């Protein structure tokens, strides 16, 4: 039921509106993330699918905007990466954020972007997610 509901939400969107949400997440206040991560109406386990929402947006951008800057518009929201972010925040002496604050996708994105900005080597949001996830998977 939850998957069907998410499909209905996506199918309700006009193609140009969907592409606009994907192309300009900040300018649309991450509206597509909000739409996809609203709690489902599943009778047994209604869920708020923030991880799915971010992955959908991330991979849709990779598909629709391949080779363009917009292909990296959405970092994947993941509990492993979320749990590792405070280590990077401390290392780079960035503004501290609580784990609860990092549950907000916009705050999560801002944190990822700050860390990437302070990294010694250029790295994409996608690259950062993969490196952190691979390193910390099984270590937390």
Task: Describe the predicted segments one by one.
Residues 1-48:
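Helix-hairpin-helix/helix-loop-helix acidic hairpins
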Residues 2, 48, 52, 123-128:
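Residue-level detector of well-ordered alpha-helical segments, enriched
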Residues 5, 60-64, 136:
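Short alpha-helix boundary/capping elements
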Residues 22, 31, 47, 53, ...:
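Compositionally biased, intrinsically disordered low-complexity regions enriched in proline and serine
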Residues 69-140:
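C-terminal accessory module of base-excision DNA glycosylases/AP lyases that mediates lesion recognition
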């Amino acid at each position: 039921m939850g998957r069907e509901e998410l499909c209905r939400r996506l199918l309700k969107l006009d193609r140009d509106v969907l592409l606009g949400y994907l192309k300009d997440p900040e300018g649309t206040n991450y509206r597509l993330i909000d739409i996809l991560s609203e709690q489902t109406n599943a009778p047994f386990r209604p869920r708020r699918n923030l991880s799915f929402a971010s992955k959908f947006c991330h991979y849709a951008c990779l598909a629709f905007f391949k080779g363009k800057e917009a292909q990296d518009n959405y970092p994947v929201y993941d509990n492993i990466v979320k749990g590792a972010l405070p280590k990077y925040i401390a290392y780079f002496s960035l503004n501290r954020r609580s784990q609860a604050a990092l549950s907000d996708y916009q705050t999560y994105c801002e944190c990822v972007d700050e860390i990437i900005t302070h990294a010694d080597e250029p790295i994409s949001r996608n690259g950062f997610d993969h490196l952190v996830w691979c390193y910390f998977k099984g270590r937390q």
